[in-house]
């Protein structure tokens, strides 16, 4: 084995993690090839395994909680659900042969407040001093083991693997990640999904620096509220009796005769206007900033359409019994490099949940992505009311 001689870092173009004596994975920023059509989404659904690089995204199914990617701060080692202090980039992790959770050279440990943090100061055992006593160096930390990611997340439409420690899930207290129970009532249990990135970050060539295709034609005011979907369903119309689950990795496809759309449900709050908003828009932002997204065909001709729906799907709804299309509200093109659009739409009624369907506009077309809060990836809904800010 080789000694790890560089730390893990994410930059805008390229990040390198050198090989390690502990069989740490080798990481590079992936390359985006315009002449290939490999389904990048498949790689992140593979098992996590030992020493395989993965990213972590957390959500809560029973209570609406947006998809949050884990960020570990380089200075403190503490772990957050969004950028915080110097934790500005999403982090990657791996589980070694001893079931220790690691990021680069650093091991996970459990802090004094049961917070999940990482450190490379792990010479925690008692050592003999000049006076003959054995004392523990309190500046050192005992690495925590018993981390595992072996159980698929989701039963009906599984994606990724559940990350747990000692068979228990993690807690979110504000934006910080904790281990164990007995914390404040403001904390909540959450599901954490490990998505394999070993193949995705196995390339040495940087992402293209070309700008994303975009059309910022919407006129949404600056004080708009941005809403993230609280339900993401893959509806397979080729299997009309297959039940769908509420949270999954998104994929809309008509490739090889498939017929699958993505339903996105938003909880639209009341404003001071009570029942209406005056300006609304859908924002589409698909990039390869962290988790991979994929588009077929990749020559820029892939077009997708969004429909307003007659109602909202429920957990375990089948496509044969789900809501129906009312009318088209948006249309956009995308490539494997990504795309970014904002389009005005008719406003949904305030104080209710509302669903939109994203579907390929033609045969042999597909798009797959992982919805996340930060970096903002996927489809968000902007709502604005004149009465909200009187």
From Swiss-Prot:
Transmembrane domains' residue ranges: none
- Which segment of the chain is annotated as a signal peptide? none
Point out the coiled-coil segments of this chain.
none
- Keywords for this entry? Ubl conjugation pathway
- InterPro entries, alphabetized: Ubiquitin3-bd_protein_But2_C
How does it associate, per the subunit comment? Interacts with but1 and uba3.
Q: Which PANTHER family match?
A: ANCHORED CELL WALL PROTEIN, PUTATIVE (AFU_ORTHOLOGUE AFUA_4G08960)-RELATED
Which family is this sequence assigned to? Belongs to the but2 family.
Protein name as annotated: Uba3-binding protein but2
Organism annotation: Schizosaccharomyces pombe (strain 972 / ATCC 24843) (Fission yeast)
* Gene from which the chain derives: but2
